[in-house]
């Protein structure tokens, strides 16, 4: 069966390549449709398959001395499921792009970049060696830069793209550490060889954690994720749902068999994910930009996925990746539809009453927010609740349970706040124009993703989980803890926004400065520290640091020596005939004396 999986997956990849290089718009759109049809076939095969073996496609690429660089693909359950989800979500985003970017003169190039973005991610997911993973890893990095800076005339877009590259370069150091250690120690880059080792050095695992933290925007390397909202909305949708940001989590899932055998590294991953999910949820509470609220929700969910890996449940982390892709892509597309209809207005405080102007988009936005909160029987419920239950029974650290539950309640709070300010209430704009929802490329993708957000949890939990995750026997209070804190957070948020709405004037609360300023991290790291170093460099110049020896030995020293030599040559040329004759006589006498002596 998995041989068929491999053929179908590679066929889907071929379809994507075909429309990437198509020059005629009709053939381009037709190829996108074929890609969507192929996903339906892949999903059908997934539902019928209950096998767990892996298929390896391997051949020699380059031979250097005694070492052969192999190209090999790994088609296991993770790869096949991600192919289905990634292709399905990207197909809908591409169709949405035809609506959102219809006035862009380079829309064909834009859609091809989106396709290349997905292909790089699929290469990363299906890689069976660190070298192939590096190709996909750098591929999603460069494509994210090109897409975030798509509107290159905007300075904020260019700054955000550079910020994404710089922060990911820090994570790339971890990946290079993995490559070097594996080659020196094992002489091979294959995952199979790494899994077979009895002991893996902590240095290697620290590289895994650093690489994952950079790519998945964990705490400390997170500022690039909300800044990336400067790109077009389809880019944000694809970036946050099924490509770049989940690459780091997927790396942790791939190496989870090794990580779970090292308790110190496992605790580090657990702690990093817990702090990220709480910090991002706190920051999302005070954001007023619609896309940034959704972006911080992504960072919070990524932290929850990392926490699941640290808690010893990588299967649940992967399940949450799949569920999260559906409703997060839909949330961004709904946000883009609202922003597009409101003439690029992104401040939620200026919105309101959008249900009357765009009812279909508003309903989809509500479904996506409910799935994000973990409302029972939607997609998010089937992945978030098991993660929280696993955290409740793990023996790593008890305080993490409380932090994750607080973050879950905050998720409900900022989701309700976002719904209230955008869809609910009355319009706070001077004139609210009706939004045209008759475009098939707008409504079709939203409806498909809305249906997926409703039924995907049932499908995936039924066909994937029984063979991978054992059922948990917990007290009723622990089973209902996630639902309870979600309900409490939503009710508190609803009460607060109603209270603030009734107040004639609202005094600025100093405590909100921390959330609104993203914990002051960008202010400290991007402004304060560089300014301090610049001032120190101006105060303590190189001559103070080394007393001028460096400058004297190189620029001034070399120049001074050449000047002395040149002066000696010039002084010898005095244009006096008598001196020239005297020198000639002296040299002649010297030569004659030497010849006589010999």
Curated annotation (Swiss-Prot):
Q: Which UniProt keywords apply?
A: Electron transport, Membrane, Mitochondrion, Mitochondrion inner membrane, NAD, Respiratory chain, Translocase, Transmembrane, Transmembrane helix, Transport, Ubiquinone
The record's annotation in Pfam families points to: NADH5_C (PF06455), Proton_antipo_M (PF00361), Proton_antipo_N (PF00662)
BP-aspect Gene Ontology terms? ATP synthesis coupled electron transport; electron transport coupled proton transport
Spell out the GO cellular component terms annotated for this protein, sorted alphabetically and separated by semicolons.
Answer: mitochondrial inner membrane
Fetch the InterPro entries from UniProt. Answer: NADH_DH_su5_C (IPR010934), NADHpl_OxRdtase_5_subgr (IPR018393), ND/Mrp_TM (IPR001750), NU5C-like (IPR003945), Proton_antipo_N (IPR001516)
**Membrane association type:** Multi-pass membrane protein
Q: Does the keyword Membrane apply?
A: yes
- One GO molecular-function entry: NADH dehydrogenase (ubiquinone) activity
Which domain of life does the UniProt lineage start with? Answer: Eukaryota
Question: What EC number(s) does the entry state?
Answer: 7.1.1.2
Keyword Zinc assigned:
no
Subcellular localization, as worded in the UniProt entry: Mitochondrion inner membrane
Mind telling me which residue stretches traverse the membrane in this protein?
1-21, 28-48, 81-101, 115-135, 171-191, 193-213, 233-253, 265-285, 293-312, 323-343, 362-382, 399-421, 454-474, 480-500, 509-529, 576-596
Quote the catalytic activity from the record: a ubiquinone + NADH + 5 H(+)(in) = a ubiquinol + NAD(+) + 4 H(+)(out)
Give the similarity note.
Belongs to the complex I subunit 5 family.
What's its job? Core subunit of the mitochondrial membrane respiratory chain NADH dehydrogenase (Complex I) that is believed to belong to the minimal assembly required for catalysis. Complex I functions in the transfer of electrons from NADH to the respiratory chain. The immediate electron acceptor for the enzyme is believed to be ubiquinone.
Q: Which PANTHER family match?
A: NADH-UBIQUINONE OXIDOREDUCTASE CHAIN 5 (PTHR42829:SF2)
* UniProt protein name: NADH-ubiquinone oxidoreductase chain 5
Q: Which organism is it from?
A: Branchiostoma lanceolatum (Common lancelet)
* Gene transcribed to yield this protein: ND5
